């Protein structure tokens, strides 16, 4: 090992050699690295990704979502345009009809998307309601009409009965994020519900055999060490997919004036996440195009092996053809 590497990065090379996650102690030390050392850390994270999480066919995991029910959410998430507690401008509509879901899913699938997520605003579903039954019908329709498409969902917090029904209807992944270090959820994200309600949902889903997609947001006011706390909380939950979002400040939300996190700090976060989760799918989600801009490829080399394409819930995404080209370019570094 070259003596020019920072000693903590040298120690972290054990992840590459063994496939074992970095320790919390070492991750915390890596979080304190100066910005001048970040590219060496990125290089290690890319090597770990290529060896232990190379992606589908050696490529990039890509998924798309549809905002199937928008706005008037009773939760007070500080980053979210859809909360009725915030004054952001956002489209408001109830659950769309299944034909609209099928049309959008088919269009995305024809462009090469393999995973499609149905997303709804609101707390979630403690019980199976008529609206929830409509969502189950959408899932069944997509399975019938697009059998090669993996159908996913993000419907908020769930009771046991709705979780069991999603398993019975063959959902591929369920997204529910813890967003930040659990100890700071109430302060940084929301206090109309607790992070424990999210964690309980994750455990219910896993008990029914559903793979969970769970990650967080960079830029809510958390420290680097608190980001690492979130990363290690995800280890304990043993989730399958980890989406990392970079905050896109939205006018009319409490975080509209949030200070941006530096590119090296974000890259460091992605790299540490990869070293803590050597074989997981780590997806770069919101903020890829609007915040990272010219540096989004750097995060794909800092350990990410997937991204959300085709747009987000209330912000626009990038052209899917451009994303296909990006995926091809990233693959050349494998």
From Swiss-Prot:
Residues 55-285 form the Radical SAM core domain. Keywords: 2Fe-2S, 4Fe-4S, Biotin biosynthesis, Iron, Iron-sulfur, Metal-binding, S-adenosyl-L-methionine, Transferase. SUPFAM superfamilies: Radical SAM enzymes (SSF102114). [4Fe-4S] cluster binds at residues 73, 77, 80. Belongs to the radical SAM superfamily. Biotin synthase family. Homodimer. This is Biotin synthase.
């Amino acid at each position: 090992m070259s003596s020019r590497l920072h000693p903590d990065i040298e120690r972290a090379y054990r992840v590459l050699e063994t496939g074992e996650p970095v320790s919390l102690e070492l991750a915390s030390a890596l979080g304190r690295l100066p910005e001048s050392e970040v590219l060496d850390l990125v290089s290690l994270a890319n090597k770990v990704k290529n060896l232990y999480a190379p992606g589908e066919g050696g490529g990039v995991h890509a998924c798309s979502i549809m905002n199937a029910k928008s706005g008037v959410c009773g939760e007070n998430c500080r980053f979210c345009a859809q909360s009725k507690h915030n004054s952001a401008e956002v489209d408001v509509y109830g659950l769309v009809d299944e034909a609209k879901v099928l049309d959008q899913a088919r269009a995305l699938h024809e462009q090469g998307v393999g995973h499609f997520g149905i997303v709804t605003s609101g707390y979630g579903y403690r019980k199976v309601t008529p609206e929830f039954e409509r969502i189950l019908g959408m899932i069944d329709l997509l399975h019938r009409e697009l059998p090669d498409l993996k159908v996913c969902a993000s419907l908020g917090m769930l009771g046991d009965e709705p979780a069991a029904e999603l398993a019975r209807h063959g959902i591929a992944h369920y997204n529910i994020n813890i967003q930040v270090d659990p100890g700071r959820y109430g302060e940084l994200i929301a206090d109309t519900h607790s992070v424990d309600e999210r964690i309980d949902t994750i455990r219910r889903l896993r008990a029914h055999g559903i793979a969970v997609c769970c990650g967080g947001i960079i830029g809510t006011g958390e420290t680097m060490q608190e980001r690492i706390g979130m990363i290690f909380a995800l280890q304990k939950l043993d989730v399958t997919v980890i989406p990392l979002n970079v905050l896109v400040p939205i006018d009319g939300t409490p975080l509209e004036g949030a200070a941006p996190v530096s590119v090296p700090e974000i890259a460091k976060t992605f790299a540490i996440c990869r070293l803590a989760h050597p074989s997981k799918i780590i997806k770069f989600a919101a903020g890829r195009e609007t915040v990272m801009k010219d540096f989004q490829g750097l995060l794909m080399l800092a350990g990410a092996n997937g991204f959300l394409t085709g747009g987000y819930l209330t912000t626009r995404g990038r052209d899917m053809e451009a994303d296909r080209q990006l995926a091809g370019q990233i693959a050349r570094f494998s």
